[in-house]
Amino acid sequence: MGIKDWPQGEGPREKLLLDGAEQLSDAELLAVLLRVGLKGLSAVELARMMITEFGGLRSLLTASQAQVCRLDGIGPVKFAQLQAAVEIGKRISKENLKRGKILSDPDLTRDYLMRQLGDRAYEVFAILLLDSQHRVIQFVELFRGTINSASVYPRDVVGLVLEKKAAAVIVCHNHPSGIAEPSTADRRITERLKQALQTIDVSLLDHMVVGDREIVSFAERGWID
């Protein structure tokens, strides 16, 4: 039975309008984007199959076009619809953390970093530059590739901080493996950066490591002070 044949109010679109998007399952939300299913398969059933195939909604939405379009009934148009939804989420997150925003909400920072770095297939080391009142100046990706204590240069970080006249920073990087637990190398990098920033009287507020589903904060673990 297709969604159009469901009793009134039971389809995912109607459910969203009546109860709110937060009440929908992952498959139902995806079905709203897909709009239609396949012959003999409703949009919700197709969505559930897609999520199962990729092992989760996040893995599906960060997969390549070639990977997604290998699924029956999924072509470039549906892939484009999904990517547009993902990009809208990222842009909303950027607006929430736009220049001049006072960084007082840890959850907002986590959400922003997860959206920016959580789906990368390669390592990215980035820095969030703040002024003396902890207002956002800029988010900058500094290094890409295999991040270790030898590939992150404190002088480059210090140079950027001086250029942007930042008074405090949050550094962050992702683990493409999906496991956010910091390594020994991560702790070494943090200590080197902290010492380098102290020479120019700039505070290192945190180092956040982004995994697939979580972010580990050095500050929360007491590793910054």
From Swiss-Prot:
Top-rank taxon, per record:
Bacteria
Q: One short Pfam family name for this protein?
A: RadC
Query: Residue limits of the MPN domain?
Result: 102-224
Q: Which UniProt keywords apply?
A: Hydrolase, Metal-binding, Metalloprotease, Protease, Zinc
The answer to keyword DNA repair applying to this record is no
- What positions carry the motif JAMM motif? 173-186
> Signal peptide position in this chain?
none
Per UniProt, what is one GO molecular function of this protein?
metallopeptidase activity
* Any Gene Ontology biological process: proteolysis
Q: Which PANTHER family match?
A: DNA REPAIR PROTEIN RADC, UPF0758 PROTEIN YEES-RELATED
Q: Which family does it belong to?
A: Belongs to the UPF0758 family.
Q: What is this protein called?
A: UPF0758 protein swp_2203
**Organism, as annotated:** Shewanella piezotolerans (strain WP3 / JCM 13877)
